[in-house]
Amino acid sequence: MARTKQTARKSTGGKAPRKQLATKAARKSAPSTGGVKKPHRYRPGTVALREIRRYQKSTELLIRKLPFQRLAREIAQDFKTDLRFQSAAIGALQEASEAYLVGLFEDTNLCAIHAKRVTIMPKDIQLARRIRGERA
């Protein structure tokens, strides 16, 4: 911003802001006596970054075991009925599925960043899968 020359102005006399400050102070003190304290909220993105760091450090499975098991059995029903699974087989399926999804989301994030965005969209997932050669 360019510097501008300041000109003298005629004063109006009394100082009005003092009254305003007094009313501000009265407003501040009034809610503290009878009002309910507002819950603390983090700024947008702070919790997301904390979760990213937390999950990048961890090695545990992110999808709950029983819902994944039900889904795997439901999908297997379409191919052959009355299939039985060892618990190790379900565990291996879940490990592989989560590894695939995490990798896909990493590539999806790179696609979003390439488009100068921070929000991933379905078109980013489609592009990532197309580049990988999974979907023509």
UniProtKB/Swiss-Prot annotation:
It is found in: Nucleus; Chromosome. The modification N6-methyllysine is found at K5, K10, K19, K24, K28, K37, K38, K57, K65, K80, K123. The lineage of its organism: Eukaryota, Metazoa, Chordata, Craniata, Vertebrata. This is Histone H3.3. The modification Phosphothreonine is found at T4, T7, T12, T81, T108. It comes from Pongo abelii (Sumatran orangutan). Belongs to the histone H3 family. The modification N6-succinyllysine is found at K15, K57, K80, K123. Keywords: Acetylation, ADP-ribosylation, Chromosome, Citrullination, DNA-binding, Hydroxylation, Lipoprotein, Methylation, Nucleosome core, Nucleus, Phosphoprotein, Ubl conjugation. The modification N6-glutaryllysine is found at K15, K19, K24, K28, K57, K80, K116, K123.
